[in-house]
């Protein structure tokens, strides 16, 4: 007989540091998610700095996915669109409810949960999925990052000129590749850059990165010293990069 042990802690102090000793296979470290961008952003940012504590056999569950709900959940907490009506579970403060997200925001949500090693539990009604929702939830390239056998936590590299809203998450993979998520939480499109020395690959190493785009499903080429791209507001780029000699 097999069983899965899940502990619901909801942001108890230092849960990351002691939860593995409990024997739990999954643990909740956040309040409940809601189907709006501000909730997704808040939960994701709450994980920055604690990425290293999850791992094989003890996974950090950032709550289910709201991808594809589009304001259509039958749960009042998740779906309310009234400004200031609901209360955020983990802080007690009110915030506006936006009645669902754009497909771009759902794509970012899925990418964040994947690279942060959270379980990818579908929350929408799969009988009513749009083609865009199905495309997001069945992206094999992004799912492969989440399911990497070594389950290493990512580390965060903040954009120097906008550290509160623009950052990259870099996750080493079992075969030596890097999974790279570049996220723009701001309200304007912006140019993002990843300097390779920040991941231990200076120009003097004679190595660069061969980069594959996990959402466009295409090879982008080989880059040295840095990778630069434009990321839409509330959007992301998810890359799989292989170290190559240049």
Where do the model's predicted regions map?
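Glycan-recognition surfaces
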Residues: 1-125
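Catalytic cores of secreted or luminal carbohydrate-active enzymes
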Residues: 108-160
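Solvent-exposed beta-hairpin/edge-strand motifs
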Residues: 197-216
């Amino acid at each position: 007989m097999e069983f899965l042990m899940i502990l619901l802690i909801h942001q108890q102090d230092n849960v990351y540091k002691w939860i593995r000793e409990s024997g739990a296979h999954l643990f909740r470290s956040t309040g409940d998610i809601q189907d709006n961008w501000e909730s997704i952003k808040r939960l994701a940012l709450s994980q920055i700095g604690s990425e290293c504590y999850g791992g094989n056999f003890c996974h950090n569950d950032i709550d289910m996915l709201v991808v594809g709900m589009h304001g259509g959940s039958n749960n009042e907490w998740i779906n309310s669109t009234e400004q200031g009506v609901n209360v955020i579970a983990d802080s007690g403060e009110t915030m506006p409810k936006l009645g669902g997200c754009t497909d771009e925001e759902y794509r970012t949500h899925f990418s964040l949960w994947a690279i942060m090693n959270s379980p990818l539990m579908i929350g929408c009604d799969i009988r009513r999925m749009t083609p865009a929702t199905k495309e997001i939830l069945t992206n094999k390239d992004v799912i492969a990052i989440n399911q990497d056998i070594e389950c290493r936590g990512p580390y965060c590299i903040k954009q120097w000129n906008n550290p509160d809203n623009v950052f990259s998450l870099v996750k080493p993979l079992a075969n030596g590749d890097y999974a790279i998520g570049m996220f723009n939480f701001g309200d304007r499109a912006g140019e993002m850059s990843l300097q390779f020395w920040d991941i231990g690959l200076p120009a003097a190493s004679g190595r660069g990165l061969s980069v594959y785009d996990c959402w466009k499903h295409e090879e982008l080429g080989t880059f040295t010293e840095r990778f630069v791209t434009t990321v839409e507001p509330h959007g992301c780029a998810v890359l799989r990069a292989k170290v190559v000699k240049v």
